[in-house]
Amino acid sequence: MSTTPVVNFITGNANKLREVKAILEPGITVQSKTVNLEEVQGTVEEVTLAKCRKAAEIIQGPVLVEDTCLCFKALNDLPGPYIKWFMESIGHQGLNNLLVAYEDKSADAVCTFAYSPGPGHEPILFQGRTRGKIVPPRGPADFGWDAIFEYDGQTYAEMDKTAKNNISHRGLALRKLQDWFAQQ
């Protein structure tokens, strides 16, 4: 008889926590821990691995960390892993303004999770990617850049939460994590 895996999801973002719990539970128990982790500069993979190693040391147990990118094709994948700071600095309209001079409004939403069973264990990466485009804000503006990322005619903000979780970058990455746990 197997036991339900437990992970300590390291986040201070209530919206992310809700999404992760909605996707993973009841198969994987998600506990929330807020730990102030310094974000290194680098690729999304480097950032996520560094955060996971540090969190595992602090928590002294199994941890799950996440890093999200929004990659504008016209800007050679910027803002990429720096989307959080771009959002805080220039908001939805500013992000749209970055693409005014370009015909190509396509973008990839990329979510990278790292899981570690604890300190001393090398983290395992799980990545999901959704191709969409950047549009003027539509829908509630209460979750990051969801209101400007359109997939198949709807922004993430306009979508029903279950529908979004089925196709989103975060949902895709978490399904890979679920598959990995099922193999253990």
From Swiss-Prot:
Its main location: cytoplasm. This is Inosine triphosphate pyrophosphatase. Keywords: Cytoplasm, Hydrolase, Magnesium, Manganese, Metal-binding, Nucleotide metabolism, Nucleotide-binding, Nucleus. Pyrophosphatase that hydrolyzes non-canonical purine nucleotides such as inosine triphosphate (ITP), deoxyinosine triphosphate (dITP) or xanthosine 5'-triphosphate (XTP) to their respective monophosphate derivatives. The enzyme does not distinguish between the deoxy- and ribose forms. Probably excludes non-canonical purines from RNA and DNA precursor pools, thus preventing their incorporation into RNA and DNA and avoiding chromosomal lesions. GO terms for molecular function: dITP diphosphatase activity; ITP diphosphatase activity; metal ion binding; nucleotide binding; XTP diphosphatase activity. It comes from Colletotrichum graminicola (strain M1.001 / M2 / FGSC 10212) (Maize anthracnose fungus). Belongs to the HAM1 NTPase family. It catalyses: ITP + H2O = IMP + diphosphate + H(+); dITP + H2O = dIMP + diphosphate + H(+); XTP + H2O = XMP + diphosphate + H(+). It is found in: Cytoplasm; Nucleus. SUPFAM superfamilies: ITPase-like.
